[in-house]
Amino acid sequence: MKLSRRSFMKANAVAAAAAAAGLSVPGVARAVVGQQEAIKWDKAPCRFCGTGCGVLVGTQQGRVVACQGDPDAPVNRGLNCIKGYFLPKIMYGKDRLTQPLLRMKNGKYDKEGEFTPITWDQAFDVMEEKFKTALKEKGPESIGMFGSGQWTIWEGYAASKLFKAGFRSNNIDPNARHCMASAVVGFMRTFGMDEPMGCYDDIEQADAFVLWGANMAEMHPILWSRITNRRLSNQNVTVAVLSTYQHRSFELADNGIIFTPQSDLVILNYIANYIIQNNAINQDFFSKHVNLRKGATDIGYGLRPTHPLEKAAKNPGSDASEPMSFEDYKAFVAEYTLEKTAEMTGVPKDQLEQLAQLYADPNKKVISYWTMGFNQHTRGVWANNLVYNLHLLTGKISQPGCGPFSLTGQPSACGTAREVGTFAHRLPADMVVTNEKHRDICEKKWNIPSGTIPAKIGLHAVAQDRALKDGKLNVYWTMCTNNMQAGPNINEERMPGWRDPRNFIIVSDPYPTVSALAADLILPTAMWVEKEGAYGNAERRTQFWRQQVQAPGEAKSDLWQLVQFSRRFKTEEVWPEELLAKKPELRGKTLYEVLYATPEVSKFPLSELAEDQLNDESRELGFYLQKGLFEEYAWFGRGHGHDLAPFDDYHKARGLRWPVVNGKETQWRYSEGNDPYVKAGEGYKFYGKPDGKAVIFALPFEPAAEAPDEEYDLWLSTGRVLEHWHTGSMTRRVPELHRAFPEAVLFIHPLDAKARDLRRGDKVKVVSRRGEVISIVETRGRNRPPQGLVYMPFFDAAQLVNKLTLDATDPLSKETDFKKCAVKLEKV
C-alpha cells in the first residue's frame, strides 16, 4: 500500500496517541488510516461517556470502517480510550435489530406471545390503540416514557414536547435520574443554576486533585491521562482519592483514602470544621458572595410510603432550609472533630489531616471531582452541597485551576437530560413544570393553549416502576436505555410491572437487550452516526455531528419514531375542550402539525443541506428538522445564562461551551472577566440566585438505608469497568472488549473469601433480601475491596446484579443508591 506523506504522518499520529494511553490501535484502523482516497472522514463526539472526546469517523461503502482520535478536538487532543478505538464495531453486532417485533399469538398481539416481525405501520397501529385507550380511560397519568442521557439534544426536546405538551403528561424521565439527578439538585440548591462552573482546562492549572467516589482511571480515562500528565510533570501537584474500595485511580494517589460507606458526609463536614478552626476562610469572598442555611434532616430514603424507614422519618422528602448565622454554622461543624471523624470513617487521622490541608492552603488550587460515589447515594444531594461548602469557604471556585466539578457518565446527560429538561419536573434552561411563569413561557413559544402543560410533577424513574407494578401506569415507552438491567430491585419493583397484562411496554433499541426481551413491542433504532445528532458534555460543551451512514434494514432514529408517531393523534383526542376553545385554530390538527411541522420549526429548507449530505428524517419531511428543533429550543436559554450558539456554528467547531455570547464561549462561569453575565466590579456573581450569592448548607451525617447485619454481613457496591460501558449492550458486541472482560466477577478481600471457604475462580451465590445471582470469586486484580465489602460491575446480562440492589433513593433528587446494600455469600 503506497502512502502519501500526509497519510504517513496521520497514521503515525494515531499510533503515537494509542501508545501514550497504553493502547493498541485496532487492525482495521491501522490498515485504513492511510487510504485517504477510499475513506471519507468526518467528525463526531464519542458515543460513550460524558467526557465528550472528539473522534474522526471513517466511512466506506455505506459502513463505518474506522475511528481515530480527532487531533483538533480540545477535549482529548487526538487520544482515544480503548472503547473509543472500537466505536465502529458497536454498530455491527450480529444480532442488530432491523425490523419492529411484536409479541403475537394466532396472528394478533398477545402478552405471552412470541416476538414476530411486523411493519412500522403495524407497530404504530398497536401503539396508537394502546395510547388512545389509556388516555381515554385513565387520562395522561396512565402513560409514560423513560428516556436517556444518550438521546441527542433534538431527540430529547422532541420527546419532551410530545409528552408534556402533546399528551399533557409529565411522566417522562431520563435514565440520568439514576446517575446525575443528585448533581442537578445540588447545583440548584447551592447556585440556583445547573452544571459546573469550570472546565477541563482547569486540569493543566491545578495544584491538587481530589476524587470523591470517582474512578477516573477507568470511567474517564482521557481526563485521567491529562491529570496523570499534570501530576507526573510537576512534583508539587497532589492527588487524593477517596473511595469505599481500592481501584486503579489509587495507583496515582499521594493520599489514597478508603472510608466506611456513607461516611463521606462526615469527612466533608470535618474538612469544613478544619478550615474554620485554622482560620483558612477566604473572608473577602465569603462575606460578599455566600449565604448560610440549615437544611431539614431525617428526610427518609425515597422508598415506598409504607416502608418502615419512610414511616419513621420525621421530614420525609423535605427540601426545606432556614437561614443561620456563621456562629451557628461554626458550632454545627465543630462536632465533626478529627477524632470523631477517624472513628466513624475508619480513616487514619494523618490521612484526614493531609486531605483537609489541601483545601485549607490558600496557595493551592484544588479541583474536586466526583461521579457516582457521590450521586448514587441516599444523601447524594447533601454530598454535593457539602463539597461546594469547602470551595465556597475558601473561595476556590470559578477561577482557572480550582473548583468543584461533577463529572457525567453519559454523552448527553448534561446536554439533553439536564439542559433540554427531559426530567419529570423540568423544562428547558432550568425551568420547572411547577412554576406557572415557566409553563407560560413554554406554552407561548410552542403556540399551544395556556394550561396545556400540567403543573404536577410527573413520575420519576423509580416511581414509574412502582406505578407500573401497581397498575397505575399502563403504557410505557423506553428509548436508548436498558433499565431492566440498569435499574434497581429488578425482581420486586420492575419485572412485575413490565409483565403485568394490564400494561403495554415498548422498547426502542438497536439490540435485543434484557429490556427489549422483557417488552411487548421492540422498535429497531438507528445508532450514533446513522443519524444527525448533538450531545452536551460535562464541561458544558455542545457538539454536533452529521449523519454519515444509513441504519440497517428498517431501523429508524428515535427522532423519526417520535415525530412519525405524533401524526397518529389529533388535538381533540388528547386535549380537553376548554384548552381547544383557547386556540380553536388548532382543532383537527395532528400533534405532528402542532409540535413539529410548525412555522417555527419547519422554516429551515432542505437547501441548507449539501446535496450529498445524509439526513433521513429531514429529507422525508421536506425541511431541516434538526435545525428547526434546535433553534426553537436554544431560544429558551439565550439571554438567561444558558446561551447556545447558532446551529451552523456547531457544525464548524469542535464544540462550544455555553454560555456562548457574541460568538465567544465561556470557560469559567460566575467570575468577572470570564463570564459575560458578571459585570465589571462585581468580582463574582452567582446569578442563578436572586441576590447573586451561593449557599453553604449545614447538613449532618445520616446512615445508609441498609447496612450489613449478622445475616447479610457484607456491603455490596456496584459500578463499571474500563472495557464495558453501562449494561454492555454495545461493548459486549465488540469481540476485543468482550474478550478483555468476558463476564462480571465478584471482587472480594482475600480474607473474606478465605473465611467463607472461597477461592479465586469459585462460583458463588450473592444473596440480598431482594434476590440472588451467581458470580465468580475474584480476590486479585484492579479492584481491591476492604474486608466487609464486595464489588460487582453491572455490565453482564447473565449476572443481573440489580436483582440485589435496593430501590432506596435520595429523597430530594430521587436518584438511586447503587453503592450500598447488604448481601451474604453462599458457595455454589
Swiss-Prot record:
Positions with a binding annotation for substrate: 794
Catalytic activity reported: 2 Fe(II)-[cytochrome] + nitrate + 2 H(+) = 2 Fe(III)-[cytochrome] + nitrite + H2O
GO molecular function list: 4 iron, 4 sulfur cluster binding; electron transfer activity; iron ion binding; molybdenum ion binding; molybdopterin cofactor binding; nitrate reductase (cytochrome) activity
Cofactor (UniProt): [4Fe-4S] cluster; Mo-bis(molybdopterin guanine dinucleotide)
One cellular-component annotation, GO: periplasmic space
Superkingdom field: Bacteria
Annotated binding of [4Fe-4S] cluster, by residue: 46, 49, 53, 81
Subcellular location: Periplasm
Chief location bin: periplasm
Enzyme Commission identifier(s): 1.9.6.1
Signal peptide, first to last residue: 1-31
Note describing how the cofactor binds: Binds 1 [4Fe-4S] cluster.
Post-translational modification summary for this protein: Predicted to be exported by the Tat system. The position of the signal peptide cleavage has not been experimentally proven.
Keyword annotations from UniProtKB, A to Z: 4Fe-4S, Electron transport, Iron, Iron-sulfur, Metal-binding, Molybdenum, Nitrate assimilation, Oxidoreductase, Periplasm, Signal, Transport
Swiss-Prot/TrEMBL GO biological process terms: cellular respiration; Mo-molybdopterin cofactor biosynthetic process; nitrate assimilation
Residues that hold Mo-bis(molybdopterin guanine dinucleotide) according to the record: 83, 150, 175, 179, 212-219, 243-247, 262-264, 372, 376, 482, 508-509, 531, 558, 718-727, 802, 819
Domain 4Fe-4S Mo/W bis-MGD-type span(s) in chain numbering: 39-95
HAMAP family with a match to the protein in the record: Nitrate_reduct_NapA
Subunit structure: Component of the periplasmic nitrate reductase NapAB complex composed of NapA and NapB.
Protein family: Belongs to the prokaryotic molybdopterin-containing oxidoreductase family. NasA/NapA/NarB subfamily.
Role: Catalytic subunit of the periplasmic nitrate reductase complex NapAB. Receives electrons from NapB and catalyzes the reduction of nitrate to nitrite.
UniProt name for this protein: Periplasmic nitrate reductase
Organism whose genome encodes this protein: Escherichia coli (strain SMS-3-5 / SECEC)
